[in-house]
Structures are given as C-alpha cells and as structure tokens.
Amino acid sequence: MKMSAASDHLLAAQETQMQCIEKDSRLLQDHACYWGAVRREKLLLYAARTKGLKTIGCVPVPPCSVTAEQAKQAICMQLIVEELLHSPWAKEPWSLTDLSWERYQAAPKGCLKKGARVVEVEYDGNSSNKTWYTAWSTVYVRGTEEEGWETAVCAADGQGIYYCAGMSSKVYFETFETDARRWSRTGHWTVRDNDVIYHSTFGAPPHSRNDRDCIEGFWSDAGERRGSRGSDTTDRALPYPAARQSPICRPVRTGENRSRAVHRQAPYSAPSSPGSSVGPDSPSESSRQVPLVLLPGPSDPAPPSPDSTDVIAEGDKEPERFSILSKPGGQPCLILSGNGNQAKCYRFRCKRYFREHYQHITTTWWTVGERGSERHGDACVLVTFKDSSQRGVFLKRVPLPPGMRAQALTMIADF
C-alpha cells in the first residue's frame, strides 16, 4: 500500500462523511452513503495498522482493536439502512441521528427510535427528588427475516417504560423500581408522561388513595381486595396535577431477592387478651409479630420504650458542636462565586495547596428559588479566616481564576 494512495482514499472517505453531515439529509440513500464512507475509513485504518503504520499523512492510526470495533459498527448500521430502503418506512424522513450507533444502542437496545420525550419520576411526593427517563414516540423493532422491521408504540406506566408491537405483550426496557431502591424512602413514586400521571404499582401511592389501605397484599376494605397483578397491569391514569392527600399507611417495599412466604398472615390486629400480647422484654419477638408496613416511618416516630431510653451519666456532657462562626466580635470571610465547575475546582485546589491560608471552607452552594430546588445566581463557596490579616494573605497568595469574583465581609452571630 503506497502512502500517497492510502492518504487519498482516507481523505476521500472523510470528505464524504463531512458532506453527508453538512447536508443534514432526511433520505436513507444519503445515510447509506455516510455509513459506507465510515466503513471504508475504518477498514483502511485497520489495514494500515496491521502493516505497522502509525500515521497516514497527518491522521494518527488507532490500534487494531479500536478500528475493528468501529468497522463492525459501521457495517451493522449500513446493513440496517439498506434493510430500511426495502421496507414500508423507506419514504419516512430519517435523520442521521435517528440512524446513529449511539441511539441504536440506547434503551431499548437493538431498536431504532424516533421522537424522544422526557418521562419524569418523582419519589415520595418530594418535588426535589426526581429522576428523568427517555421515552420514544415510535420504536422500530426487528422481527424475523420474513417480517423484517415493524413499528411499536412506546409508552410509560407506573411500573416503567415499555414498547408494544401489534398484539404482543409489553416489553419493559426501563423499570422504575431499580432506581426507587436507591432514591425512595417509602417505596412510592409518581410518573408524569406528558399530561398523564401514574402511580407506582407496588403499593398505595403517596398522598393518594386514602379511601383504602393495602397491607402485604390485603385491602382494608372488606369488600375490595386486590388480587395478583400481571406485569402488564397499570394504574389508572389521572389528569395532571393529581390531588394530594395524606396517606393512611406507609408501605415498605422489599427487594427482589428477599424471600417471602407463599401463605401470608392476616394483617396485624390488637391482641384480644392480655395473655396474647408480647411484653417489652422481648423486642425481637414483637418486631416479628408486626408486619413491616406498620412499623413507624420517619415522619411518624413512635414514643421511646423504657428499654430504648438512653441513659446518660450524671457527669457526662454533650460534646461541643462545631460552628463556622467561632470568632467573637466578627468573623472575617470571603464569598467566592462563579460557575459550578469553577467553584468546586477552586475549593479542591485551596484544600490541597493552600490549607494554611484560611480557617474553614464550605461546600459549593447556590441560592434556591421560590419553588422546588431551582438555582438562582452563581455557585458560591464561603471561606472563613482567623483574622483580617490572614484574609489579606489569602487574597495575595491564592490566585483567583478568570470568571470568579470574591466578596469580603465580616459575619457576626447575634445569638
């Protein structure tokens, strides 16, 4: 392989890619041309590396493992585009982003997607505790060789985000319970998909359904009990915003790997006779008699029992609490503000290289807005000093990055 010929072929392939990107076409023929150029580029780089070349002209040659993987991706996408050219969706508008490898690998993996939208999940009825997922207006699923590609409807419910092709069952590619184990305290979440709201299917949703109560699968209403629900059963959609009321109980979800008895006991009720009750001398036995869902939650703490009361010795004193304003008569301070990344990096640099030039430094903080956790203004860091002279030395020896500003002030604690 001559170096000049290899360089010409490589530049031609890269030029074709740039033309296809700048054209911003919606035709499958142009996208097939783009992926063909990517395939030729990666195969050329792979061949050059196998012959020991490190560069082709000014272009560095990656390792064979990198170019081989990229060539496989380009071949896969080129074959998909050629399949779509002979499908009923060949006349539809397709962007290069719709046919990118990254979107093809995004959930649901191995499918083509169009029309991204955001699905919001709020945990425990807390507007500042949210997660966002991506749903799609249309999902193209590859069937058998005879069926080819077929379209599927993508939607969300209280369990997760799924797609459903034709009369087939729901296929979930995002389940909210996984993240709920990390971010939720009560096991409840609220799903908002456009103007429709759903609740978690694993228990009574927070701040709703106060007319009945669910304890370990049993409904408190005598004439209304919930049986087993399939994975494709969803809660009734409520118009947004949903009415929020106080919940009756605080259900607790268990993990997937936690063993549970097949035959469950009836919900806990007060003992009918004094002899059947469990005394305070056996707390472990008492905790086994009461289901998890009836244990007090963080918002409704139970009064301490005699056995759980802390005993404090007469001579012991409560340890002194830390206070950032430790200097009487006024604490010299600096408020350093900038963007979030600047403030965090500056704090890290101060702690690592200039620790002797200040007394205390805070984490990065913002001013919150009137609703939720909306941030106002720049990110800030508060730095305190022993005296004004130490603050002056700090300003002289610790450089301030461009874009950040410092405000000097003296803070006095009134009480």
Swiss-Prot record:
The keyword Phosphoprotein applies. Disulfide bonds: none annotated. Residues 330-415 are annotated as: DNA-binding domain. It holds the Pfam family PPV_E2_N. Phosphorylated. Residues 222-235 have a biased composition (Basic and acidic residues). Its main location: host cell. One of its GO terms (cellular component) is host cell nucleus. GO terms for biological process: DNA replication; DNA-templated transcription; regulation of DNA replication; viral DNA genome replication. Residues 1-205 are annotated as: Transactivation domain. It is found in: Host nucleus. GO terms for molecular function: DNA binding; DNA-binding transcription factor activity; nucleotide binding. Residues 267-287 have a biased composition (Low complexity). Gene3D superfamilies: 3.30.70.330, E2 (early) protein, N terminal domain, subdomain 1, Papillomavirus E2 early protein domain. Belongs to the papillomaviridae E2 protein family. Binds DNA as homodimer. Interacts with protein E1; this interaction greatly increases E1 DNA-binding activity. Interacts with protein L1; this interaction enhances E2-dependent replication and transcription activation. Interacts with protein L2; this interaction inhibits E2 transcriptional activity but not DNA replication function E2. Interacts with protein E7; this interaction inhibits E7 oncogenic activity. Interacts with host TAF1; this interaction modulates E2-dependent transcriptional regulation. Interacts with host BRD4; this interaction mediates E2 transcriptional activation function. This is Regulatory protein E2. It comes from European elk papillomavirus (EEPV).
